[in-house]
UniProtKB/Swiss-Prot annotation:
<dbReference type="GO" id="GO:0005148">
    <property type="term" value="F:prolactin receptor binding"/>
</dbReference>
<dbReference type="GO" id="GO:0050679">
    <property type="term" value="P:positive regulation of epithelial cell proliferation"/>
</dbReference>
<dbReference type="GO" id="GO:0046425">
    <property type="term" value="P:regulation of receptor signaling pathway via JAK-STAT"/>
</dbReference>
<keyword id="KW-0372">Hormone</keyword>
<keyword id="KW-1015">Disulfide bond</keyword>
<keyword id="KW-0597">Phosphoprotein</keyword>
<feature type="disulfide bond">
    <location>
        <begin position="33"/>
        <end position="38"/>
    </location>
</feature>
<feature type="signal peptide">
    <location>
        <begin position="1"/>
        <end position="29"/>
    </location>
</feature>
<dbReference type="GO" id="GO:0042711">
    <property type="term" value="P:maternal behavior"/>
</dbReference>
<dbReference type="InterPro" id="IPR018116">
    <property type="entry name" value="Somatotropin_CS"/>
</dbReference>
<dbReference type="GO" id="GO:0030141">
    <property type="term" value="C:secretory granule"/>
</dbReference>
<keyword id="KW-0421">Lactation</keyword>
<feature type="disulfide bond">
    <location>
        <begin position="85"/>
        <end position="201"/>
    </location>
</feature>
<dbReference type="GO" id="GO:0050673">
    <property type="term" value="P:epithelial cell proliferation"/>
</dbReference>
<comment type="similarity">
    <text>Belongs to the somatotropin/prolactin family.</text>
</comment>
<feature type="modified residue" description="Phosphoserine">
    <location>
        <position position="53"/>
    </location>
</feature>
<dbReference type="GO" id="GO:0008284">
    <property type="term" value="P:positive regulation of cell population proliferation"/>
</dbReference>
């Protein structure tokens, strides 16, 4: 493995270690608004949602790795689960350069759509993981934590839109995950395949949200001075 690959792996392991430490000690990102009073500056709002989105993505990564360790033992099984994600039909920037070309208010509403669209599959993930044999509390607890933190993230993105681009409020794309398979009455392997794909796609979307918010924080809150 080259030095760059080693550094990336070390960085991922460090993030997972921090995530586990924070989770076990019940240390969470600051709330977006305290006691319903939101006088937070735009810059601070961006700082908080970026920390929160990164925390959520780290929890997804942690859960995905743990799910594979628990249930996926061979590569043939993993190949079966590589399907398109439900949000693949949403036109999203592929990298930072493309993201910078998208009007900020459009990108914010796209982020909002991705965060909103995760609610139903997250709920199904929680009920689905609880229904498989020997379901580890470790995975279930992280799914529930993500569900709660997602509500905070949604609130934060909505506050940013209201402050920075009030005219764009309500212009988001209402996107629903279609073809969410029923997990009732299916065999154990099919259930695991479905749940793994759900986690993979949610993790993919959370990575997009995290990256887009970092681009927007630099662009809006720091006037591209970062």
């Amino acid at each position: 493995m080259n030095s760059q690959g080693s550094a990336q792996k070390a960085g991922t392991l460090l993030l997972l270690l921090i995530s586990n430490l924070l989770f076990c000690q019940n240390v969470q990102p600051l709330p977006i608004c305290s006691a319903g009073d939101c006088q937070t500056s735009l810059r601070e709002l961006f700082d908080r949602v970026v920390i929160l989105s990164h925390y959520i993505h780290t929890l997804y990564t942690d859960m995905f790795i743990e799910f594979d360790k628990q249930y996926v033992q061979d590569r043939e099984f993993m190949v079966k689960v590589i399907n398109d994600c439900p949000t693949s039909s949403l036109a999203t920037p592929e990298d930072k350069e493309q993201a910078l070309k998208v009007p900020p208010e459009v990108l914010l509403n796209l982020i909002l759509s991705l965060v909103q669209s995760s609610s139903d599959p997250l709920f199904q993930l929680i009920t689905g993981v609880g229904g498989i044999q020997e379901a580890p509390e470790y995975i279930l607890s992280r799914a529930k934590e993500i569900e709660e933190q997602n509500k905070q993230l949604l609130e934060g993105v909505e506050k940013i839109i209201s402050q920075a681009y009030p005219e764009a409020k309500g212009n988001g794309i209402y996107f629903v995950w279609s073809q969410l398979p029923s997990l009732q009455g299916v065999d154990e392997e099919s259930k695991i395949l479905s749940l793994r794909n759900t986690i993979r796609c949610l993790r993919r979307d959370s990575h997009k949200v995290d990256n887009f918010l970092k681009v927007l924080r630099c662009q809006i809150a720091h006037q591209n001075n970062c």
